[in-house]
Amino acid sequence: MTALKNDRFLRALLKQPVDVTPVWMMRQAGRYLPEYRASRANAGDFMSLCMNPEFACEVTMQPLDRYPQLDAAILFSDILTIPDAMGQGLYFETGEGPRFKKVVSTLADIEALPIPDPHKDLGYVMDAVSTIRRELNGRVPLIGFSGSPWTLATYMVEGGSSKDFRKTKAMLYDNPQAMHLLLDKLAQSVTSYLNGQIMAGAQAVQIFDTWGGNLSAAAYQEFSLAYMRKIVSGLIREHEGRKVPVILFTKGGGLWLESIADAGADALGLDWTCDIGEARRRVGGQVALQGNMDPTVLYAKPEAIRTEVGRILASYGKGTGHVFNLGHGITPEVNPEHAGAFLRAVHELSAQYHE
C-alpha cells in the first residue's frame, strides 16, 4: 500500500504530535457542492450513487479536490445500508428522507432478520472503499463508518426518520427482550461491516450514534452505549502496520462523556452544545476529541467563521488530541466558499497551539 503523505488526522486521534490541528467535515461530500449535485443527477438517484463504487469514489474525492486543507476523506455511503442488507427495502422519498418497505415490530420480525455478510451482501461498500483508497494514493487517510445499533434500530422500527421515536421507545420499555435481540444482531452486523471496511482499506472508523442523545441517561447506557462498547471490543485495531483509530459520536451525549470515554474508542465526537475545553478537562486524558463547531456558523460571513474557529481552538488549548470538525453534518444550503474559509482558518489559526 502507498505510504500516507498526510497522516496528521490519524496522529491527532492517537494523541501524537502534529504541526496544525487536522480538519474534516461530516457530510463533506454532499449537496452543498455543485459538483456533487451534478454527479447525483448523472447517477439518477441517491442509492445509485451509493451502490456504484465508481460514483461513490467520484463524490468522495470532490471535496478533497476543491479543498486542499482537508486532512481526511470519508467513504460516501449511508448508515442505512445495513438494514437494507437485512431485507428491510430501503428507498428515499423526495422531501421525506429514508423509508423502509418493511418495518420491524414484533419479536418474530427480529428473529427472522439475517446478519449480513459484508462481502456478499454489502460488497458494493467494500468495493467503494478499495476504489477510493486506490484513487487517494496516500493523499490523506480514508474514514469508514457505520450507524450505531440504537440509531439503526430507530429507523427499522419507525420505518424511517422520526421526531419522537414513539414505536421504538414503546418497544424498548414494553418489550426490552425484543429490543435487546435487535440491538445484539445490529451490533454483530456493524462489527463485521466495519471490519470489512478496515480490511478493504479504511484507516479509521467512526460510529454515528445520531439518536443516542434522545434516550434517558439509564436507557442510553443499556440500549446504546453497551452495544457500541461491544462493537469497539470486536474491531480490528491494527492493519497495514498501523493502528486503526475508532471514533464514537453520540449527538447529544455531552452529559455522558466519562462513560463514553470508557467504551474503549480512541476518540469522541462532540456536538456543538458541549464546550470542548470542558470536555478536554473531563476526558482528554483518556481520549482524543473531534468537533465541534455549530454547522450553522457556516451561514455567517467568513470573518465570523474565523472568529468562532479561533474561539474553539483557544478553548481546547495547546497540544494534540483534537481533530477539528463540525458538531454535525454540513447542511445543503451552505456556500462552498464559506466551507473553504472554515477549513483555511483551522490550519492558519491552529499552528500556534502546536509549537
UniProtKB/Swiss-Prot annotation:
Q: For this UniProt entry, which residues form the secretion signal?
A: none
One GO-annotated biological process of the protein:
protoporphyrinogen IX biosynthetic process from glutamate
UniProt cross-references to InterPro entries, sorted A to Z: UROD/MetE-like_sf (IPR038071), Uroporphyrinogen_deCO2ase_HemE (IPR006361), Uroporphyrinogen_deCOase (IPR000257)
Q: In which residues is substrate bound?
A: R27, Q28, A29, G30, R31, D78, Y155, T210, H328
Marked site (Transition state stabilizer) residue numbers: D78
MF-aspect GO terms: uroporphyrinogen decarboxylase activity
| Stored SUPFAM superfamilies | UROD/MetE-like
Protein name per its UniProtKB record = Uroporphyrinogen decarboxylase
**Classification lineage:** Bacteria, Pseudomonadati, Pseudomonadota, Gammaproteobacteria, Pseudomonadales
Q: Which gene encodes it?
A: hemE
